[in-house]
Amino acid sequence: MSPAAAQTAIPLPSTDLPVKIITNGLKNLNYTSKQGYGNFDTHFYDGQDEVSPSGLLKIRKSYREKSKYPDYLPTWDPTEKYGPLEFHEYHDPALRADGNFSNLFAKENVGQLKVKKITPKLGLEINGIQLTDLSDAAKDELALLVAQKGVVVFRNQNFADEGPDYVTEYGRHFGKLHIHQTSGHPQNNPELHITFRRPDAEEFARVFDDSTSSGGWHTDVSYELQPPSYTFFSVVEGPDGGGDTLFADTIEAFDRLSKPLQDFLSTLHVIHSSKEQAENSQRQGGIKRRAPVTHIHPLVRVHPVLKKKCLYVNRAFSRKIVELKRQESESLLNFLYNLVESSHDLQLRAKWEPHSVVIWDNRRVQHSAVIDWEEPIHRHAFRITPQAERPVEDLKFLNDENYYPSSLTLDI
């Protein structure tokens, strides 16, 4: 059992009451939001899934028996509780790396190495390197490569075959691993985030019940005090075609704005919240491991490795620009959402093949799953999510525990 799994259960208060935000001198801000159709591939689904005699929630038996990777199937334990995540310093492994990539692209592997740009500015596809063979120095260079390219797709990997314990330990090289507030994880591996879209026509139809698109652009758990750095994701089972993942570059999006707008945006801060995600889980009969959190982050953050500015807003978890009135905030946020989501010339489409691992820089890119297959085929994937630094608008605040404006409390 991992250290995180062994933490003492902590009783947490209900959060079904309205949220009041206290912002260290800023006005109290009240807000409401609806979050699309919910996370049906990460949350327990009452009526589809099962409850064991011990109270453990799990995927139904008929799906478990057909799984090619049963060790990665999600479970949800209603007794598993954690306190709030605490601040910790983060030292990006990319800052330790050899910029010549002499370990990652070792001379002895050059003959079998195939590297292809996915787009001129964003993304690489690599064949001929096994992630499981990398030394610690090569992993540092991997972090640097992902920061520089935004998204790196590795083909023909044995990564998932090594099992949940191995991939969890692998992820720890890149930072303290995040434990999700509601999603399923393999038993005894709480740091793995599992997505499992069930092969059920009704569930597929639910995606489009209230929307004309399956798109759900976001950056992972931006509501946390210290959101992730390098996200590792692998689809272990899925459709033969479709189910791709879209990525958009928020550095490029920021660079395309006019200088006056760039300067104005760089003075603003945004509320990010997990409240709606937790409510979605509970509506579906699922769990809540921690009390929902709300944090304020700069609208424009500086990437600690690239020293470049990124737009740090996303439709899933951003709620309001602190300094603006509600209507002003909604108009500006929608403009920025649409800029990132609709500018296809700053995006790429990662196609899933068996034994692929995609690694992306969660600070730089947004992503969205594409649900476009029609047959009732399940899509099963796992994610490793190392936490990064607290987002800052100036690197002089990097790893400063007293940096404001992220700190706030929930009056619940």
Curated annotation (Swiss-Prot):
Entries under SUPFAM superfamilies matching the protein: Clavaminate synthase-like
Note describing how the cofactor binds: Binds 1 Fe(2+) ion per subunit.
Top-rank taxon: Eukaryota
GO BP terms: alkanesulfonate catabolic process; sulfur compound catabolic process
Pathway: Organosulfur degradation; alkanesulfonate degradation
Alphabetical keyword list: Dioxygenase, Iron, Metal-binding, Oxidoreductase, Phosphoprotein
Record-given protein name: Alpha-ketoglutarate-dependent sulfonate dioxygenase
Taxon lineage: Eukaryota, Fungi, Dikarya, Ascomycota, Saccharomycotina
